[in-house]
Amino acid sequence: MAARMCCQLDPARDVLCLRPVGAESRGRPVSGPFGPLPSPSSSAVPADHGAHLSLRGLPVCAFSSAGPCALRFTSARRMETTVNAHQVLPKVLYKRTLGLSAMSTTDLEAYFKDCLFKDWEELGEEIRLMIFVLGGCRHKLVCSPAPCNFFTSA
C-alpha cells in the first residue's frame, strides 16, 4: 500500500521533492510501517530496517520534514522497461549531479509523477519494486546499499 505523494520543485535548492499529498507547505515527516521514521538528526537507520526494503540506502533527506529529494529515486521495474530505455534515467540524473545539461526539470517531474508513482500506487510494494539510489541530490547516505553499476553499464 503506497502513500499518495506529489513532486514539487524547490527553486532554492533546484531539486524535486517528494511530499505527501495534502501536507503543509513545509512538509511533514514520512511514516513507515513501524510508525514515524526517525527525525533528521538521527544518524542511522533503525535496526529492524531489513524488514522493510524501502528503508535500505535512504539518504538523510528522506527523514527531513521537507521530504526526500525525488531525484535520488526510481524503481527497479522502470529500469527494466523500454519506456525508460531512450531516456537512460540513471545517466541523466548523474549528469545533473555534475552540472551538465540533461533532461529538463519539467520532464523529470512528469516522469516521476506519471510513471513511478502510478506504479507504486497501483502495484503496491513488492520485491521487484525496490528503491534505488541513483544520485541527483547531494545528501549523504544514511546506509549505503549494495554497490551497483548503473552509471558504468548501459
Swiss-Prot record:
Keywords: Activation of host NF-kappa-B by virus, Activator, Apoptosis, Host cytoplasm, Host G2/M cell cycle arrest by virus, Host mitochondrion, Host nucleus, Host-virus interaction, Modulation of host cell cycle by virus, Transcription, Transcription regulation
Gene Ontology CC entries for this record: host cell mitochondrion; host cell nucleus
Pfam family name, one: X
Compartments where found: Host cytoplasm; Host nucleus; Host mitochondrion
GO biological process: DNA-templated transcription; symbiont-mediated activation of host NF-kappaB cascade; symbiont-mediated arrest of host cell cycle during G2/M transition; viral genome replication
Record PTM: A fraction may be phosphorylated in insect cells and HepG2 cells, a human hepatoblastoma cell line. Phosphorylated in vitro by host protein kinase C or mitogen-activated protein kinase. N-acetylated in insect cells.
Residue ranges of the region described as Mitochondrial targeting sequence: 68-117
Principal place of residence: host cell
InterPro entries: Transactivation_prot_X (IPR000236)
Function: Multifunctional protein that plays a role in silencing host antiviral defenses and promoting viral transcription. Does not seem to be essential for HBV infection. May be directly involved in development of cirrhosis and liver cancer (hepatocellular carcinoma). Most of cytosolic activities involve modulation of cytosolic calcium. The effect on apoptosis is controversial depending on the cell types in which the studies have been conducted. May induce apoptosis by localizing in mitochondria and causing loss of mitochondrial membrane potential.
Family (UniProt): Belongs to the orthohepadnavirus protein X family.
Subunit structure as annotated in this protein's UniProt entry: May form homodimer. May interact with host CEBPA, CFLAR, CREB1, DDB1, E4F1, HBXIP, HSPD1/HSP60, NFKBIA, POLR2E and SMAD4. Interacts with host SMC5-SMC6 complex and induces its degradation. Interacts with host TRPC4AP; leading to prevent ubiquitination of TRPC4AP. Interacts with host PLSCR1; this interaction promotes ubiquitination and degradation of HBx and impairs HBx-mediated cell proliferation.
Protein name, as recorded: Protein X
